[in-house]
Amino acid sequence: MTTRILTGITTTGTPHLGNYAGAIRPAIVASRQSDVDSFYFLADYHALIKCDDPLRIQRSRLEIAATWLAAGLDVDRVTFYRQSDIPEIPELTWLLTCVAAKGLLNRAHAYKASVDKNVESCEDPDAGITMGLYSYPVLMAADILMFNAHQVPVGRDQIQHVEMARDIGQRFNHLFGKGREFFVMPEALIEESVATLPGLDGRKMSKSYDNTIPLFSSAKDMKSAISRIVTDSLAPGEAKDPDNSHLFTLYQAFSTPEQCAQFRSELLQGLGWGEAKTRMFTLLDEQLGEAREQYLSLIERPADLEDILLAGAQKARRVATPFLEELREAVGLRSFRTAVQNADTGKKKTTKGARFVSFREDDGSFRFRLLAADGEQLLLSRTFADGKAAGIVSKQLQQGGELDLRSEADRFTLWLNGECVADSPVFADATARDNAVETLKLALAPQQD
């Protein structure tokens, strides 16, 4: 089976060593596998959320495109495109926006962090918050679901967005699928071995901290940047601790095991920091020198980059265009030439049943809610260690069968295989509780034609 992998980089800055080691290099390695279908894109719509400088965005798009190619991306093996060259993506974003719950978006980490920052500053909670920031998880869901990606490589801080894409995709399937699963449920791919590099000051290398080493800066500028890496004050001849050295962590990400072992040994034997930084520069210059020349050549040929990206967009749209037509048909945005069935020709009456919504708690555990057709919460599950366990339980409930419901004063619980798996809300009295039990049984009963 071929696995489709999708990843994008937001075009708001110049690529640095952290981008390369943490995202670009592992993605290029993965793209060479015979059983992988890779979709890589420049997330320039996302960039508009973070940056209002047109020249910076334009320059960043050019630099990131050139970086991917100079680093060895084979555009004949992958689909490489700009997000803004795929008009189906914003259209799908709107279709998904119309089924995305506001409560789901309220829980997005970036939005909550912005609100919390405003509250701490005694400002209006929504001060400076745009609809772009608030709803960008829907745009990210469209990026993923447009191509039915199986896996999305992300950092741990991005797991929530993949889970939100799943929630939104499930909701669309439930409302419009009529037995068909339009969207594959994507999985977040966490690469534990992928490097998170320290910046010049020891914090995570990030444009936000202004502590980056540009990937393809000139040899002179790279040497100057490396010389500014923070180290301790131990003199040459004094033993250094590699495990607490930002310089060693950086060296480790680019060296072979043999080179790394040698560098560690020399630090323990008292190698001076000045000489250690010189070796760091030599290692990077040898590894990146040829790619730097290719990068500079591509930067000088923007028309060639444009042609490559437009060809990639055509390739991507061969997937996106017919799929979006199916989705438009599903929601009722149909051509008037499409035959419309009426009730006299045997159209079945259908009712919208209950639906399951899964989510992840801040502590990493998984839960699901069972919501009635009108949105009322019928059940809230207990916590599960992983999403698979939660999915097994919700799938069992969807299969119908006798329910083990146990009344407890002003609420009831649901049991499976001798274990309590979900709780009802608290009710005003026993009558309301018993009515809710009947509603739950009806909601989980197999649908009849």
From Swiss-Prot:
GO terms for cellular component: cytosol. Keywords: Aminoacyl-tRNA synthetase, ATP-binding, Cytoplasm, Ligase, Nucleotide-binding, Protein biosynthesis. Transmembrane segments: none annotated. ATP binds at residues 10-12, 18-19, 155-157, 197, 204-208. L-tryptophan binds at residue 143. Its EC number is 6.1.1.2. This is Tryptophan--tRNA ligase. It comes from the Bacteria. It holds the Pfam family tRNA-synt_1b. The gene is trpS. It is found in: Cytoplasm.
